[in-house]
Amino acid sequence: MKYLISFLFLALAFSMKSEAKVTLPSILGDNMVLQQQAEVKLWGKARSNATVTVKTSWNGQTYKSSSDGKGGWSLTVSTPVAGGPYKIIFNDGELLTLQNVLIGEVWFCSGQSNMEMPMGGFDRQPVRGTNDIIAKAKPSTPIRMYTTDSKDGRWVRQFSKTPVEDCQGEWLENTPVNVSHISAVSYYFARYIQEVLEVPVGIVVSTWGGSKVEAWMSRESIKPFSSIDLSILDNDAEVKNPTATPCVLYNGKIAPLTNFAVRGFLWYQGESNRDNTDLYLNLMPAFVADLRAKWGRGELPFYFVQIAPFNYEGADGTSAARLREVQLQNMKDIPNSGMVTTMDVGHPVFIHPVDKETVGNRLAYWALAQTYGMKGFGYAPPVYKSMEIQENKIYINFDNAQRGLSPMWTSLKGFEIAGEDKVFYPAFAEIETTTARLAVSSDKVSHPVAVRYAYKNY
């Protein structure tokens, strides 16, 4: 797929859907999914100072708005319970009709390359088990996909120093070709909740490999962090590295979409922020709070993925472990959030793990339990609660372990224990059969004071 780099001072203020006077942003188009049972905003351009009418086929109702002197207009429509397909007819004297519109559940998915990685994989980097799913994809399955940067098989990487009104993208049906190009984690998530909820599902995907969270933050949200230089946003300097430049991905790939109603957010990012985990600890809550404020729909759920093990280069080999520790704290600090663990899907030499199904499904468990109120299955990982020291052992208690602990391997790996000298040694860990706690010990530490788990990159 050909990649073009575009610095977005968008001349395409709104992408054309036809030769009609009414024009719409790319996120409003044929094949889209609108959030069910919601007040949904529709907006666009028309002739200046004109009356714009919008008729929705699900209720036969006509809504009216007046365009301003520059032709901008917006209005809000009420959506019913999940269903479709429907039509939406826009009219400012000339008609524009959107076809094949579904009503269902919509999720916004963002992050860096592990969220971006498509079902068809990257070059020489496959995604395990997707070939059969891609081949069997059918338009009759009510999953619809929108990806920024992508249209007609071409990619235009979009970023901007200032917020823009529109971005390139299009809604696509569930066909083999389309599924092969969509984010694998997002698609597995959508596939799972669609099968369970039995409603249409739309995923809006906005990603860029190698990106720092700073690039995805708005100027308002990042301004309080005085250590971050924002001067490039105000001068004529060229943005040479958009993935590390504050605000430019927000401006080009999130700002144009904040009017579009969603149920919640999915996020898979962090690898590129290992160099300053203390800053990341504070950036993430600010980022999430700002996303929610920009969408203006209350405390929308935010489910994210803890980065997977990988042998990053580094002097001490613990930068990823520190980032994972910060991400755990993020889950505790950010209300209405949940974190998916990936300690069992990483690979020492492939930064893009081949198992995206496990990740997508685990995100779905969070959503089904916390957003949709389902019960009877596990969704949250065991999390450290407390510890007790008895003789030469440390006993660890966990939250989210009501049914006990179950190891992936025959013996537990990754535990280390230390005495007063704070020198950590590999430790033996075993699950107590009658409780949801671990006993950890080492023959090299007779009086332990500290224990840690998986505190290395891989």
Language-model features, listed with the residues they occupy:
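Cell-envelope and extracellular/periplasmic
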Residues: 21-458
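Bacterial Sec-dependent N-terminal signal peptides
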Residues: 1-23
